[in-house]
Amino acid sequence: MSVKAPITQDVVTIPRKLPEGRINLVGLTRDRMREVLIDHGTPEKQAKMRVGQIWQWIYQWGVRDFEAMTNLAKAYRAQLAEHFTIEIPEVITRLVSEDGTRKYLVRIAGGHEVEVVYIPEEDRGTLCISSQVGCTLTCSFCHTGTQKLVRNLTAAEIVGQVMMARDDLGEWPVPGAPKDETRLLSNIVLMGMGEPLYNFDNVRDAMKIAMDPEGIQLSRRRITLSTSGVVPEIARTAEEIGCLLAISFHATTDEVRDVLVPINKRWNIEELLSALAAYPKVSNSERITFEYVMLDGVNDSDADAHRLLDHIRRYKIPAKINLIPFNEWPGAPYKRSSNNRIRAFANIIYQAGYAAPIRKTRGDDIMAACGQLKSATERARKSKKQIEAETGL
């Protein structure tokens, strides 16, 4: 009997509630921020305006101190400071690769840790963020998959990773200064720790904040969500987020994908392709990215390349195929395909008319490359009662 991957998970999301009882405004939707402001003394008629002002200070200017919000009355600033706070994850370690890649280990509520990676390139700067502490999917080639799932990240902890990186890059604009169109952090990829679609609501709320035109102001075309194939949530992603989609495909037969990406036992290749075919039209995306890690003797044959093309053509999916040389980690059960084999695989796809870039490995000297992320301090799964005790809830 085959093992079914779960549709939902036995995992809790811990809200960011500080010991003194103040509410963290980071991660709240505009509607929720309006509610909490009214609950703590903001006149209802002023609440929408106040949300707009505070929102810009937090997400456009990167301000964390209410006293610095100079377009608010001094008494109101004091009132805000009494009831609210502006908190983001704490950076524990920061490693910089020889190629300029930065890897951050950040601490969140309960003492848990996640990893975040910034990858600078000539024409862009990409931040790879996490959505869960650990992961439940146990993809056999992925280092994160060896770390037990502890919990989902809150919307504050997800968008807080973006804010933390902007802090480190010194990229918050200064009010009144000339606008600089050059952005060091121009793209977000949800390709860090965890399966984003198993934490849909928090990921959606965080990305809505990142895309807000009065805040961080990233276009949805600059945000890519990578999923292993949580089929029921793919349509929701198109409708409610509308960002670009990448699929961790990695195999062309169910037999191999069941091993590499075990969620395939729940939603097989045909079910996945059917869901992917509808995504571009609903989300207005030009194409879907197929991520394909190259494993020596496992999924890298010419026959695999032709099967991959057959899948894409059969479902008429506008696609780009990202070929990823396997980044080895201690105890990994696979080896990287040879450069010649990867190039031959890419050439078959390219000759068929599809883009097939070979991803340049970045940050592997600091274990920041694709598939290498894992918290330095690993935590086992905890019960809701244990987590609540840790966080003082």
UniProtKB/Swiss-Prot annotation:
S-adenosyl-L-methionine binds at residues 194-195, 226, 248-250, 327. Its EC number is 2.1.1.192. Residues 121-365 form the Radical SAM core domain. Its cofactor is [4Fe-4S] cluster. The active site is at 115 (proton acceptor), 370 (s-methylcysteine intermediate). It catalyses: adenosine(2503) in 23S rRNA + 2 reduced [2Fe-2S]-[ferredoxin] + 2 S-adenosyl-L-methionine = 2-methyladenosine(2503) in 23S rRNA + 5'-deoxyadenosine + L-methionine + 2 oxidized [2Fe-2S]-[ferredoxin] + S-adenosyl-L-homocysteine; adenosine(37) in tRNA + 2 reduced [2Fe-2S]-[ferredoxin] + 2 S-adenosyl-L-methionine = 2-methyladenosine(37) in tRNA + 5'-deoxyadenosine + L-methionine + 2 oxidized [2Fe-2S]-[ferredoxin] + S-adenosyl-L-homocysteine. The keyword Zinc does not apply. The keyword Magnesium does not apply. Binds 1 [4Fe-4S] cluster. The cluster is coordinated with 3 cysteines and an exchangeable S-adenosyl-L-methionine. Belongs to the radical SAM superfamily. RlmN family. Specifically methylates position 2 of adenine 2503 in 23S rRNA and position 2 of adenine 37 in tRNAs. m2A2503 modification seems to play a crucial role in the proofreading step occurring at the peptidyl transferase center and thus would serve to optimize ribosomal fidelity. This is Dual-specificity RNA methyltransferase RlmN. It comes from Ruegeria pomeroyi (strain ATCC 700808 / DSM 15171 / DSS-3). The gene is rlmN.
